[in-house]
Amino acid sequence: MIRHLSVILISCLLVAASCSTKIISTNIYQEQKEDLDNIERRYEKLNPKNHFSLAFTDKKFNIVSLEMITDTLTRIYEFTVTEKRLADTLIKYDYDTAGIYYLIRKMQQTKVTWINSFDYYVNDQPQQLIILSIKPVTIRYIFSPPKYIALSYFRTAQSFDEKGRLLDSRRTKQVRKIKGQVFYKITDRICYTITDKYR
């Protein structure tokens, strides 16, 4: 009897945990929608001229990793946010210094750990998506690694199945994975997944 009760309790906890991650993910987006969408828009405006990504590498959001990407070379630097070398590096490589500092401040305030863009193709047409990761304090189970919510912003409306999973296209039921992860619908062009890694 006790064994059956334990099995039922564990099953209920697992179901509640899987449901709560979806609720937590969509709630975090809804609660911070304005800030998150602002970060995505700012990044989109800054990125085409000089491609880059930003990631915070410490828990207090004081150390930022700046990845500057060109056709031939990728430079990766790590700075404390207040360090003068950060501004000097941005100026040296002709980045919008004020714009990137604004983005860094917004990411700190919203607890966005990473932002980057990726190119992909659909029917031989180039597409782009922007992914940002958030580290909410609420998603943490006993004996489990920290969890991150990854949001992907597409330029156009996407297709989803009846479970809300991102599909390759309207004409197929094949689930599309990004970086090995299944993404779920928030809006027609914004999806989320829960991941152990922030990038």
Task: State what each model feature region is.
Residues 1-30:
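Bacterial Sec-dependent N-terminal signal peptides
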Residues 4, 8, 12-13, 65, ...:
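Acidic/proline-rich low-complexity IDRs
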Residues 6-7, 83, 100, 178:
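Hydrophobic alpha-helical segments and their boundary regions
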Residues 8, 12, 16-17, 49, ...:
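Low-complexity, intrinsically disordered/propeptide-like segments
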Residues 10, 36-39, 186, 190:
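Generic hydrophobic secondary-structure signal
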Residues 15, 50-53, 57, 165, ...:
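General "foldedness" signal
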Residues 19-104:
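N-terminal export/targeting and maturation segments
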Residues 91-93, 97-199:
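Extracytoplasmic electrostatic interaction patches
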